[in-house]
Amino acid sequence: MKEPMVITMAREYASGGSEIAQAVADKLGIPLYNKELITLAAKKSGLTEEAIAASENQRSGSLIYSLYMMGNTMPLADQVYILQSNVIKELAAEGPCVILGRCGDYVLRERPNVLRTFVYAPLKTRIQFAKSRPDAKDMPDRLWETQLAKHDRARASYYNYYTENRWGEAKNYDCLLYTSPSPRDTERSR
């Protein structure tokens, strides 16, 4: 029996990856798993959603998590990575879906019928996109640059640590999506 098609999507912060993942899932009529992975991992583990969310994009070598987990054999970040990996594998086995982030491309690396994608955009585009969000703070572009870099460093550090690959490196993905607005897109939006 053929394995269901799964699309994994990693992305730079504010590159439009979340929106693209939702559009792909809607167009194909398949579920998108993003923050739902936190809820599902919490249900399986007995950990709180808050603890799982706080440990995302953290590596087990973090001092905060080492202190938090004193006395336990496995750091929380490692527990969460394993939990979410198991949830991702279970969801992929259940049927077609889109998995956003959480090293999905690596977790499903040995599984057939997985399209591994990475979404990226130029810094200027990402700043404009971040500023246009309803919950965006009003701050100068240089501070947005700092925020974007901080989020990307956390994602890269987490991915690089757990996968021993490099986050965003083309050889880890089947498809790279560049989300800079083209003149054609600008015309269409008028």
Task: Indicate where each model-derived feature is located.
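Conserved phosphate-donor/acceptor-positioning beta-strand/loop module used by diverse small-molecule
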Residues: 110-131, 148
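Short beta-strand-centered segment that lines the nucleotide-binding/catalytic pocket of NTP-utilizing
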Residues: 32-42
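A conserved segment at the C-terminal end of the G1
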Residues: 22-28
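Pre-Walker A (Motif I) flank of P-loop NTPase domains
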Residues: 3-7
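Conserved small/polar residues in nucleotide/adenosyl-binding loops
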Residues: 178-185
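ATP-dependent small-molecule kinase phosphotransfer cores
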Residues: 41-96
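C-terminal accessory "lid"/substrate-recognition subdomains
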Residues: 144-174, 190
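Glycine-rich phosphate-binding P-loop
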Residues: 9-22
